[in-house]
Design a protein with these regions (language model features):
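Conserved catalytic cores of phosphodiester-cleaving nucleases, focusing on short active-site segments
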Residues: 52-74, 91
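Short, solvent-exposed loop/turn elements at beta->coil junctions and helix N-caps
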Residues: 38-45, 111
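Acidic-basic catalytic patches of nuclease active cores, encompassing PD-(D/E)XK
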Residues: 1-41
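Catalytic cores of nucleic-acid endonucleases
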Residues: 2, 70-118
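Anionic group-transfer/hydrolysis microenvironments
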Residues: 38, 53-55, 69, 113, ...
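Short, low-complexity, polybasic intrinsically disordered segments
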Residues: 118-131
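Structural motif
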Residues: 63-65, 107, 120
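A short, glycine/Asx- and small/polar-enriched loop/turn
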Residues: 46-51
Length: 131
């Protein structure tokens, strides 16, 4: 099997990292401050794993858990539609774990930053813990 790597054929991880870097710069330009990138919770024998792409802090103190999704086009609903129930549950699990570091957790929300081609769509409060 032949695999192609290089500038024209970036790996899925490289593409994801580039999308997260683009999303981070875009959010910072809108006043959000990075708290942590790629926060991971390991999968255990009785627990789901999870990862939060970006943990940001809004100017009002709200902790913003950001899922970055990239798609080349809007087929199958585009990037935003790819954050379904299972993915939301993994994000919620990781966020609950992250919030354990606070004696009094700050207000928080779950955003999706959808990169479809050259466009960026910011879905603030895309879902909540009751979803």
């Amino acid at each position: 099997m032949v695999t192609r790597q290089g500038p024209l054929h970036a790996s899925t991880k490289q593409q994801g990292d580039a999308a997260e870097t683009r999303a981070l710069a875009w959010l910072q330009a809108r006043g959000l401050r990075l708290e942590e990138r790629n926060y991971r919770v390991a999968r255990g024998p009785h627990a789901r794993g999870g990862e939060i792409d970006l943990v940001m802090r809004a100017a009002d103190g709200t902790l913003v858990f950001v899922e970055v999704r990239q798609r080349r086009g809007s087929g199958h609903g585009g990037a935003a539609a790819s954050v379904g129930g299972v993915k939301q549950q993994r994000l919620l699990h990781a966020a609950q774990h992250y919030l354990q570091r606070y004696a009094t957790p700050p207000p928080c929300r779950f955003d999706v930053l959808a990169l479809d081609g050259d466009g960026i769509e910011w879905l603030q409060a895309a879902f909540d813990a009751s979803s």
